[in-house]
Amino acid sequence: MKQPNKAPRADRAAPKGTATPKRHKKTRVELDIEARERKRQKRHSGNRSGARTNIEGSNKTGSTQAQEKDPRIGSKVPVPLVVESKAKAKLTTKPVAKVEAKPRLTPEEELTKLENDERLDALLDRLDNDEVLSKEDQAYVDLTLDRIDALMEQLGIELGDDEDDEEREEKPEDILKLLKSGNPKDTF
């Protein structure tokens, strides 16, 4: 028994009136022509020369739109070259920060404080041991010792070094006496 041919189903077949044409393969000449056109379009895809630095050229198309302000251009506010009296008045009206006055130490208190300074003692010990101090440490020692000398003069305190000077002054007198007396060996 022969069965009749089945008709194609609607979901498998293309809709009526639209036939799928066969794709015909392009020839080498057609491919070359298309490639040349793509290459020509690709050449012109970038910006013109100098487009990065010439902003005016790119704004020609946007002249109908509101032009954006160039951020590289500074303020047009004039800068005063001469100081006016109004500016001085503003400066004087600023509130001055109150500086708390440190309680002044009496010279005796300051002298005892400087004499008991641990940092100064350590630096003087290093100097006695023939060590070289840094510039900051040497400056600190010099300033502190100068202040101690000034305070001692203010208070009328004399150092024991002056006694050594008096002994040195007495020795030349003794030498003169010995020379005048005649034989220096007799006096010993």
Curated annotation (Swiss-Prot):
Bias (Polar residues) ranges:
47-66
Which purpose does this protein serve, as stated in its record? A GTPase-activating protein (GAP) that modifies Der/EngA GTPase function. May play a role in ribosome biogenesis.
What protein family is recorded?
Belongs to the YihI family.
The parts of the chain that form a coiled coil are none
In Gene Ontology terms, what is a biological process of this protein? ribosome biogenesis
Q: Where is the composition biased (Basic and acidic residues)?
A: 28-37
Among the GO molecular function terms of this UniProt record, one is: GTPase activator activity
Instruction: Give the span(s) annotated as Disordered.
Output: 1-79, 158-188
**Assembly behavior:** Interacts with Der.
Official protein name in the record:
Der GTPase-activating protein YihI
Q: Which UniProt keywords apply?
A: GTPase activation, Ribosome biogenesis
Which HAMAP family does the record cross-reference, listed alphabetically?
GAP_YihI (MF_01058)
Positions with biased composition (Acidic residues)? 159-168
